[in-house]
Amino acid sequence: MKKSLQIALDGPAGAGKSTIAKSLAKQLGYVYIDTGAIYRAVTYRALNEGIALEDGPALAQMIENMSLRLVPSEEGQRVFDGEEEVTSVIRSSEVTNNVSFVARQPEVRDALMDLQRDLAKKGGVVMDGRDIGTHVLPNADLKVFMTASVEERARRRHEENVSKGIPSDYEQLIEEIALRDKRDSEREVAPLRQAEDAHFLDTTTLSIDGVVQAIERLIEEVKA
């Protein structure tokens, strides 16, 4: 077993994947790869350029002209499209509410698949998303499917928004997350689902430290 593992964290919106992935990567000395940020950057660019979010071929053409970079930082990672940093703007409610439309286009997923795999090929990575264990890294050394109740995920997202000064409505977030769950699980291309060999982890009642410790135990089992 190689020492530098590929660790895949999947799950629905607001399950805490990014928070846990950042913490794990920092403790392990691994690189954190937020694939959701990649799709958000594409969505942000499409919205700015007025490209129809369900026009897969047009989106794929747009991606060819993008220069996406993920740069490690103390907060996890910074996202750049060419020379423009889009780390903060891709977290807007407009992008959040539209990224599912972009992500379900097969041409988009194909265009971004090689980029994601290339980032992870050397191992020593923690990658989070919706279909990492099922499609992007089907041979990952450790796969964890994280989830939590819709209410808890909305509470977490609300607190995150407030801490960042982003306008937020808890009840509206519940509706938006439930709708996004439906879209993500029903899309034809790479739907949200647990990989057969993934470990299921309900984080509803767990603290960040509790989740990290649970996954660290799984890592030790893989390395044993």
From Swiss-Prot:
Q: List UniProt keywords, sorted A-Z.
A: ATP-binding, Cytoplasm, Kinase, Nucleotide-binding, Transferase
Q: Which reaction does it catalyse?
A: CMP + ATP = CDP + ADP; dCMP + ATP = dCDP + ADP
Q: What is this protein called?
A: Cytidylate kinase
InterPro entries (alphabetical) = Cytidylate_kin (IPR003136), Cytidylate_kinase_dom (IPR011994), P-loop_NTPase (IPR027417)
- Binding-site residues, ATP: 11-19
Q: State the GO CC annotations.
A: cytosol
Tell me the GO BP annotations in alphabetical order. Answer: nucleobase-containing small molecule interconversion; pyrimidine nucleotide metabolic process
Tell me which NCBIfam families the record gives.
cmk
Q: A GO molecular-function term, please? A: ATP binding
Family recorded in the similarity comment: Belongs to the cytidylate kinase family. Type 1 subfamily.
Name the Enzyme Commission number(s) assigned to this protein: 2.7.4.25
The record's subcellular locations are: Cytoplasm
- EC class name: transferase
UniProt keyword Cytoplasm present = yes
